[in-house]
Amino acid sequence: MTEAVNQSLTSDFTPSCVAETPLLMRLSPHRQGKRAVLFDHFMKRLIRHGTLHVRLPQGDLRSYGTGQGPVAGFSVRSHAALQRLGLNPALALGEAYMDGDVLPEDCTLHELLDLLTLNLMQGGAHPAEKALEWVRWTKRRLDQFNPAGRARRNVAHHYDLNARLYALFLDRDREYSCAYFQTGEENLEEAQAAKKRHIAAKLKLDRPGLGVLDIGCGWGGMALTLAREWGAQVTGITLSAEQLAVARARAEEAGLSRQVRFALMDYRDWRQPVDRIVSVGMFEHVGLHHYADFFRMIRRVLKPQGVALVHAIGRADGPGSTNPWLAKYIFPGGYSPALSEVLPAVEKAGLFVTDIEILRLHYAKTIAHWRARFAGNRDAIASLYDERFCRMFEFYLSGAELAFRRMGHMNWQLQLTREQNALPLTRDYIWQAERQSVIRALGVGGIHSQSPPSP
């Protein structure tokens, strides 16, 4: 079924097909020509590296760029899409791909987006994009107002999708966040297990029974790991009813329901003191206006000798705004902050920053694994939703990978304490704890070397 749909969508688009579209029948050749001129002007400014071939709705083939380097192409199947691409490409390209109005030609979607991203990063920004930037800057201040009610709706938009969807492209533990590649050769399961070990080591879980709060616990993978492998007493909180049901079922199945509990709760409502706090992939949904609330909450409930670890997506180029397509279709209210926007709130909360680690290309590798698994299970995913949904997710995953590979996005891990003496003076305890975790998993006793693992 999916193969037939794809074949029909990628067939040659002739002028006779265009004439059958009611909207286009109402357009004069003059108006169609103006739209083509606007689009042509945009593409000439954008493509300065490599070559891009574009087939216009009337069948004309245009080529842009240097004629050297990477090559990609796409067809535009309607003049309405052509106009939207000329006026607001950041939103229109994804929408046109979802609707079948833009189709890659002689390349994959990922290759097409890679060439476009390469040119955007080389200074080929659309003039309208620059003009709209101040509007987006203002709008993001409103979008980032994220009280409890809106936060629940925003989370439900993406995370309350059918649980089977995520099982079809994530790892077995359903870790929907950046993995940790120590060599770059790990498979997805190995890299996600390494991520959990790395975070657990930074939490310094040096004795069983420590109380841990997992803010934004997802499907429970981190909480269950901390309980099973480190003896922690964990409470995971989420705003997703779908994730909550899966996490509780997993705890019951693992025989850990007395050691791990999950609740549908906003982080602002938590009151009980805890020894450790972990938050992985949730901070992007907090909202700029609420950073102070978030870190004050950590300061309030963390015990004096406690440790907190926040793992989130960030940007290296300073404050910005969320891509409009991503904000509309994938993560409403979401924002990946620069550390310069985060650290002032940490300081005002009275917390010590004891460690900051930047994970640069780790998320690009993670999403590449997700893309491959999504493609391998595309028919099954289409049976859960439809072709348009699959196109939306393909566009999202390809764009996200390129943001981390080419556009300065990265992950950061921020370790925080209330007291200066809560942790050892050096970071040696981190690699030692990771090594001990690996040895336990292999069933080997004792540490045979005091050298840190290779980076």
Describe the residue ranges of each PLM region.
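Conserved SAM-binding loop
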Residues: 247-248
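Conserved beta-strand signature within the Rossmann-like core of class I S-adenosyl-L-methionine
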Residues: 305-313
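Substrate-binding/catalytic lobe of Class I Rossmann-like enzymes that use SAM or dcSAM, i.e.
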Residues: 313-424, 431, 438
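Conserved class I S-adenosyl-L-methionine
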Residues: 208-216
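A short glycine-rich, Lys/Arg-flanked "PGG" loop and its adjoining helix->strand segment in the class I
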Residues: 292-304
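A short acidic, Gly/Pro-enriched loop at the edge of an enzyme's catalytic core
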Residues: 268-277
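Feature captures hydrophobic
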Residues: 2-193, 198, 205
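Conserved SAM-binding loop of SAM-dependent methyltransferases across substrates and taxa
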Residues: 219-230
